[in-house]
């Protein structure tokens, strides 16, 4: 299973930069956290349903078991 951070790096496609064990930037976009959960990447809002990613920038995250199948129209 990919971590939320790995999913976002694959979705946005930039070079990840880490600060300790937290993702700090993807390309030029700054990553923001609310507590321990991801909140924003650049201007794109990250939403959760329970403990799973639900939406990225308004695009729905579709799961097949423990793996992300699709985000919006982009397949993984």
What are the roles of these predicted feature ranges?
Residues 1-76:
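Repetitive, compositionally biased segments used for assembly/scaffolding
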